[in-house]
């Protein structure tokens, strides 16, 4: 079994849809993306904020992984 790392407790999860309006590559203009914002409570009771951007296919994969985790938890 894979090792499990305790990285903290997820206390907030937000996302927003954006569209690229400036880029060094014209092929990336008007490309939609998702920005994800998370807040995590660590073992020292400190909240840290993190953000990252995903393409639409990456976000769909990310969302599917959460659905899969939810389904697995429901079977326990």
Curated annotation (Swiss-Prot):
GO terms for biological process: signal transduction. Residues 9-76 form the COMM domain. One of its GO terms (molecular function) is NF-kappaB binding. It holds the Pfam family COMM_domain. Disulfide bonds: none annotated. Belongs to the COMM domain-containing protein 6 family. Scaffold protein in the commander complex that is essential for endosomal recycling of transmembrane cargos; the commander complex is composed of the CCC subcomplex and the retriever subcomplex. Component of the commander complex consisting of the CCC subcomplex and the retriever subcomplex. Component of the CCC subcomplex. This is COMM domain-containing protein 6. It comes from Dictyostelium discoideum.
């Amino acid at each position: 079994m894979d090792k499990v790392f305790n990285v903290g407790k997820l206390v907030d999860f937000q996302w927003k849809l954006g569209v690229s309006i400036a880029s060094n590559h014209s092929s990336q203009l008007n490309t939609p993306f998702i920005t994800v914002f998370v807040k995590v409570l660590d073992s020292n009771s400190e909240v840290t904020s993190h953000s990252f951007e995903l393409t639409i296919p990456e976000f769909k994969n990310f969302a599917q992984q959460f659905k899969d985790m939810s389904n697995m938890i429901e079977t326990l």
